[in-house]
Design a protein with these regions (language model features):
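Short cytosolic juxtamembrane segments of multi-pass membrane proteins
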Residues: 28, 412-427
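Short, membrane-interfacial amphipathic segments enriched in basic
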Residues: 2-22
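Short helix-coil transition/hinge motifs at the ends and kinks of transmembrane helices
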Residues: 12-14, 83-91, 212-214, 268-274, ...
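Hydrophobic, regular-secondary-structure patches
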Residues: 57-137, 144-147, 179-180, 230-231, ...
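Mid-to-C-terminal secondary-structure elements
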Residues: 139, 144-159, 169-270
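Peri-transmembrane interface segments
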Residues: 66, 270-304
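Transmembrane alpha-helical interface segments in multi-pass membrane proteins
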Residues: 20-29, 33-41, 48, 52-53, ...
Length: 427
């Protein structure tokens, strides 16, 4: 008996729900054009929001791929022509960094984590067998340099301390050089390539494709031990560039401010010469890029939410018109016993259904567009992920529900305020 009564109750409840949803559908489709235009505002708002967020993430990925493997807390210092005369030295003097400067800076600045010198040559030509790769660059480095500009080694290894100590004629070649000299895709390790008349044994292939680099683009760069570079190309004690990273809690800007006076004092440069010492603060550049994308994301949220809010206001206005048109219907319901909360629930349900359905369609279409954009960039050298996170999608759904409820509040309260007698008299 109890089971039978429970079944009857469930059937009644289902019937009530079916009736309510049927009524919502009839109300929304009563004026199809108006409902479509109202829903389109919400659809476009959520579509813009998702596309802007996913698009900004994709662009950020593309930009980040250009900095791939580059230390974000790094800085670089080199020499430049002087702009002031000092202690008998004329203005416009050229000077060079020296090996001694490395030890001077290392002793004076313990906040530097990695400090390594490097030299470079441009316009070199590499040949192997009958194949030739021209317009290459050559870079002499220490093993520590890999912590500043991390190579992507798919074959072989990088320069090590034994290579530097023994002045070995070994090299790591870039991806483009490898593809030109070894078009059959064979393993180049152990093979000797001719670089401007000097033979070097290949020990690795660097396939890094990042567009941010120092002293040469990775795909067209031949990397050799620093000591070999000094010996083979008569650099002596000269250094073209000092590369360094800061320990946690220290900034590159402060380090560079302390490096300058050390170098100026050692090389007889005027203390107020702003040109003689050349500094590049990669940490500041990365910070600017991060701030740029933070600003883009904030702007995307503002534009997307603003458009979505405009759509929700449109829903609210249309629901107000709908309530006005249904004044008599609502009055009759009140007269035959409908509670104010029932009327309010009905209006809110209609508003939320209209908003949610339009919003879900907008999310689906936006995800489809982002997927097409990702497929379109998949074959490029800088692939990007034009996607939104799971939690962003959940957040968008919650925003839709909240806006749908808020859009229906004013019309719902107006419907609750309708008195049966006045509604019938209004008709």
């Amino acid at each position: 008996m109890i089971l039978f009564s429970s079944n009857i109750f469930v059937m009644k409840l289902l019937k009530i729900d079916i009736d309510r949803w049927e009524e919502i559908l009839i109300t929304i489709t009563r004026n199809k054009t108006r409902s479509f235009l109202t829903a389109f505002g919400v659809f476009w708002g959520i579509f813009m929001l998702i596309c802007l967020m996913g698009g900004s993430q994709g662009i950020q990925d593309m930009m980040s791929s250009n900095f791939e493997g580059f230390a974000t807390n790094s800085g670089f210092t080199g020499s430049n022509q002087t702009s002031k005369a000092y202690k008998g030295f004329r203005k416009g003097r050229y000077w060079s960094l020296e090996i001694k400067d490395v030890e001077r800076i290392r002793r004076a600045l313990p906040e530097i984590e990695i400090l390594t010198p490097s030299n470079a040559r441009w316009g070199v030509k590499a040949t192997y067998d009958k194949h030739e790769s021209s317009s290459c660059s050559m870079k002499g480095v220490y093993p520590e340099y890999a912590q500043i500009e991390t190579p992507t080694l798919t074959i072989g290894r990088f320069i090590n301390h034994i290579d530097v100590k023994e002045r070995r004629k070994v090299c790591v070649i870039g991806k483009q050089i490898y593809e030109t000299l070894f078009p059959d895709g064979s393993n180049p390790c152990g093979q000797f390539i001719n670089v401007n008349g000097i033979y070097y044994q290949v020990i690795g292939v660097n396939t890094s494709a990042g567009n941010m680099s120092v002293n040469g683009w990775p795909p067209t760069t031949i990397t050799i031990p620093f000591s070999t570079m000094q010996q083979n190309y008569n650099f002596g004690n000269q250094i073209q560039l000092l590369s360094y990273t800061a320990r946690p809690g220290h900034s590159i800007k402060n380090i560079q401010e302390r490096i300058e006076p050390i170098l100026k004092q050692a090389h007889m440069i005027h203390p107020e010469d702003k040109q003689a010492v050349m500094n590049v603060n990669a940490e500041a550049l990365f910070g600017m890029v991060d701030n740029l994308f933070k600003g883009i994301k904030i702007l995307s949220w503002m534009v997307g939410l603003g458009t979505l809010l405009a759509g929700a206001i449109g829903v609210s206005n249309i629901m107000m018109v709908t309530v006005k048109e249904r004044t008599t219907e609502i009055g009759i319901r009140r007269a035959i016993g409908a509670k104010p909360l029932d009327i309010m629930s009905q209006i809110l349900s209609e508003s939320m259904v209209l908003t949610t359905v339009a919003g879900m369609l907008g999310i689906s279409f936006a995800v489809f567009v982002l997927q097409m954009m990702e497929i379109g960039t998949a074959q490029s050298d800088t692939p990007a992920h034009f996607q939104i996170s799971f939690w962003m999608a959940i957040g968008a759904c919650i925003i839709l529900l909240v806006l749908g409820m808020l859009a229906g509040l004013a019309p719902a309260y107006r419907a609750m305020a309708i008195k049966p007698i006045e509604a019938i008299r209004d008709e």
